[in-house]
Design a protein with these regions (language model features):
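Membrane-interface helix termini and inter-helical loops of multi-pass transporters
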Residues: 31-37, 62-68, 94-106
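Structural signal for the C-terminal ends of transmembrane alpha-helices
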Residues: 27-31, 53-63, 89-93, 175-178
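Hydrophobic alpha-helical transmembrane segments
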Residues: 12-20, 75-80, 108-112, 140-148, ...
Length: 204
């Protein structure tokens, strides 16, 4: 029996919880509709449930998972640099792109509130909960590890955007890592997403 089963396996239960939990939450988001609005679904799935697990199951302070302003001076600097560098790139790639226009035109309604709710939850999920949980075990490699599910969550979006997300996810993770906060990558991501919708739809 020992030959068949092999050596005894040992796992970090928090890593297992975050890995399995985040995978299931992403799948639930894809297959189910909890509320009439997708962004409220994501508040539940990507913010409330992870916070509940951190507080009740892990018995930890959410600050340990980037739920704070962290190094706010550095964060403001990265946010300004991110917005200034990405704005012309987004305008160049998104302006007149028919596939992006077709995809993003329906998202104009409710801006910027809808992207705010959507992305503050996404950023805590990837750049807070997953990143800082993995960083304890995997160190800097956590930056790439959290970028993988982030990139896969973009499948179905315009190709040029989806292909770039593994690198964008790493960059957002690096900002969160340096500032010890998910807030600053959220602000950059919020600007990028809102600006993409406005440019691709022809609103600006």
């Amino acid at each position: 029996m020992k030959y068949l089963l092999g050596e005894k396996l040992s796992f970090d239960w928090k890593i297992v919880t975050v890995t399995v939990g985040s995978t299931l939450l992403l799948m639930v988001d894809h297959y189910y509709k909890i509320t009439p609005f997708k962004y409220w679904d994501r508040v539940i799935l990507y913010l409330i449930i992870p916070l509940f697990i951190i507080l009740i199951l892990f018995r930890e302070n959410p600050k340990e998972y980037g739920f704070s302003f962290g190094d706010w001076k550095l964060g403001l600097t990265y946010t300004a640099l991110g917005i200034l560098s990405m704005a012309p790139i987004i305008y160049f790639l998104g302006s007149g792109n028919t596939s992006m226009q077709k995809y993003y035109e329906p998202y104009l309604h409710g801006l910027p509130w809808t992207t705010f709710l959507d992305l503050i939850c996404w950023e805590f999920f990837f750049r807070g909960w997953i990143l800082f949980a993995y960083s304890r075990k995997f160190g800097h490699n956590a930056l790439w590890l959290q970028a993988v599910p982030f990139a896969l969550a973009h499948v179905g979006k315009p190709e040029i955007e989806t292909l770039s997300t593994i690198f964008g996810g790493f960059a957002f993770g690096w900002v969160a890592w340096r500032t010890k906060s998910f807030v600053w990558p959220f602000l950059i991501h919020w600007f990028i997403a809102t600006f993409i919708i406005l440019v691709a739809s022809g609103a600006i």
